[in-house]
């Protein structure tokens, strides 16, 4: 009799749980199918160019793909890409050129989507400091942030433009110190991201700086990309596709309405940015987005990567050159 009572009690409890789940809109199958946890780690602190991914997160595009995505800050491209290579993270979001160099050094990572065909790097000076071409950097000091892309690219940039490297005083420091030193005019010039640093600096100083666009002077290397652990991507192709589909939707929305994307991103910032600066950052970033006609956002052709490898090889920044498919793939894009 007691066994029958226990069975009845268990059945009653099960029925109650099922009823509660159905009332809450959760089916037993859905309860078992937990969302796949994914971390996308940026290679730097939060900035306007990351807005499309937060749009995808905010609008539920990742969730709709069955993903539980965490968007996390980083502290430098080399560090974050290495974390992906050793399997500590699944994805890095940052400069493709650093991933290319990592692959050549046998780190098992691969670029699965490229969102900027060219890295928006620049060098600025105050109006009274002449700066029209790279040659003008001779005899001047140049502030560079440790861990940022240009710190690795400054030598090839100067070499490409016939600048005597020994005549340029390169001063490496952290991001906040770099800006402080430049604002106090203790350094003559400063390396910046045109999509992030420049809008902020111009807003703070109310100054129109002299600007060298690095890409316009020959150093055109692929920019923002999603970089995956190679083995993990091969073992989880559908998860990679889901991440790229959702991210592309965030990009499409941000391209269609940069102002709304900036407002969405602002919600996720602990330290709020000036709304005008943030909107300008997003607009400039969206204008540089790699969205080829008739192809998915993030798709690239072989010529882009061949040109990148040629440039890095010619300037001595690529010790070992591998086959193109070692560096990138379009296979996960739909």
What positions do the PLM features span?
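Short, surface-exposed acidic
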Residues: 165-169, 271-282, 318-326
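Conserved C-terminal helix/tail region of periplasmic/extracytoplasmic solute-binding proteins
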Residues: 305-334
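Secondary-structure end/capping motifs
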Residues: 235-315
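Sec/Tat signal peptide C-region and signal peptidase I cleavage site
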Residues: 26-32
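Short, glycine-/small- and polar/acidic-enriched structural segments
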Residues: 32-184, 188-195, 212-214, 220
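Bacterial N-terminal signal peptides
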Residues: 10-25
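Pocket-lining segment of extracytoplasmic ligand-binding domains
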Residues: 97, 177-181, 185-271
């Amino acid at each position: 009799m007691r066994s029958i009572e226990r069975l009845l009690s268990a059945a009653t409890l099960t029925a109650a749980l099922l009823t509660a789940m159905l009332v809450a809109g959760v089916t037993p199958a859905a309860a078992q199918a937990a969302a796949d946890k994914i971390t996308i780690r940026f290679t730097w602190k939060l900035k306007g160019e990351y807005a499309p991914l937060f749009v995808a997160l905010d609008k539920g595009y990742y969730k709709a793909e069955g993903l539980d995505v965490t968007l996390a800050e980083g502290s430098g491209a080399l560090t974050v890409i290495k974390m992906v290579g050793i399997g500590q993270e699944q994805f890095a979001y940052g400069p493709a050129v650093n991933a290319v160099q990592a692959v050549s050094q046998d780190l098992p990572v691969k670029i699965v989507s490229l969102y900027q065909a060219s890295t928006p790097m620049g060098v600025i000076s105050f109006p009274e400091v002449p700066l029209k071409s790279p040659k003008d950097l001779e005899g001047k000091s140049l502030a560079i942030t440790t861990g940022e892309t240009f710190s690795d690219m400054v030598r090839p940039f100067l070499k490409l433009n016939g600048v005597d490297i020994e005549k340029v005083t390169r001063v490496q420091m952290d991001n906040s110190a770099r800006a402080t030193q430049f604002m106090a005019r203790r350094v003559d010039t400063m390396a910046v991201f045109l999509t992030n640093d420049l809008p902020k600096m111009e807003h703070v100083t109310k100054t129109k700086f002299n600007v060298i666009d690095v890409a316009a002077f020959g150093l055109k290397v692929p920019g923002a990309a999603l970089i995956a652990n190679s083995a993990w991507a091969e073992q989880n192709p559908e998860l990679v596709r889901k991440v790229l589909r959702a991210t592309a939707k965030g990009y499409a929305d941000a391209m269609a309405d940069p102002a709304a994307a900036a407002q969405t991103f602002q919600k996720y910032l602990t330290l709020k940015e000036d709304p005008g600066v943030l909107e300008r950052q997003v607009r400039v970033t969206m204008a540089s987005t790699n969205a080829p006609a008739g192809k998915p956002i993030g798709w690239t052709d072989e010529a882009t990567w061949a040109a990148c490898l040629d440039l890095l090889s010619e300037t001595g920044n690529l010790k070992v050159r591998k086959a193109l498919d070692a560096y990138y793939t379009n296979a996960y894009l739909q």
